[in-house]
Swiss-Prot record:
Name this polypeptide is given: F420-non-reducing hydrogenase vhu iron-sulfur subunit D
InterPro entries referenced in this protein's UniProt entry, alphabetically: MvhD/FlpD
Cofactor(s) recorded in Swiss-Prot or TrEMBL: [2Fe-2S] cluster
Enzyme class (EC, first level): oxidoreductase
Molecular functions per Gene Ontology: 2 iron, 2 sulfur cluster binding; metal ion binding; oxidoreductase activity
Organismal lineage: Archaea, Methanobacteriati, Methanobacteriota, Methanomada group, Methanococci
Quaternary context: The F420-non-reducing hydrogenase vhu is composed of four subunits; VhuA, VhuD, VhuG and VhuU.
Cofactor note: Binds 1 [2Fe-2S] cluster.
Domain of life per record: Archaea
Length: 134
């Protein structure tokens, strides 16, 4: 089986810095991750409607700022609630709420970024391919 496709919606302020540092530090993680930089993870619901699981990603994670570090003040808290709701919806649809997760990190958390990628890859392998994949 090919590596599962993981979409990572990463905050420009924090998650992107962690992903960039992971790359420049030559940290190892599956190449099947698709990082999508967003201005703030608080806008995640919009991106989820047009990308991610509906488009066939096997798993999705959101990498947002740590609590009280969001440049937009509450973006990371609002997305945390949206991720919880999305998990419930995916469970009700029979797709699996474990296909989505929220991770908090700073721009210096390269290790946290690679752990998130690896965790979501392992989850996607256990869950199998996204049933919405064409």
């Amino acid at each position: 089986m090919a590596e599962p496709i993981i979409m990572a919606f990463i905050c420009y302020q924090c998650g992107y810095g962690a992903a960039d540092l992971a790359g420049t530090s030559r940290m190892q993680y599956p190449a099947s991750v698709r990082p999508i930089r967003v201005p703030c993870t608080g806008k995640f619901l919009y991106y989820l409607r047009i990308k991610g699981i509906p488009k066939g990603a096997d798993a999705v994670f959101v990498a947002g700022c740590k609590p009280n570090e969001c440049a937009f003040e509450t973006g990371n808290f609002s997305v945390e609630e949206r991720v919880k709701m999305t998990k419930q919806i995916l469970d009700e649809m029979g797709i699996g709420g474990d296909r989505i997760e929220m991770f908090f990190m700073s721009g210096a958390d390269a290790g946290k970024f690679t752990e998130a990628v690896n965790e979501m890859t392992d989850r996607a392998k256990k869950l199998g391919p996204n049933p919405l994949k064409k």
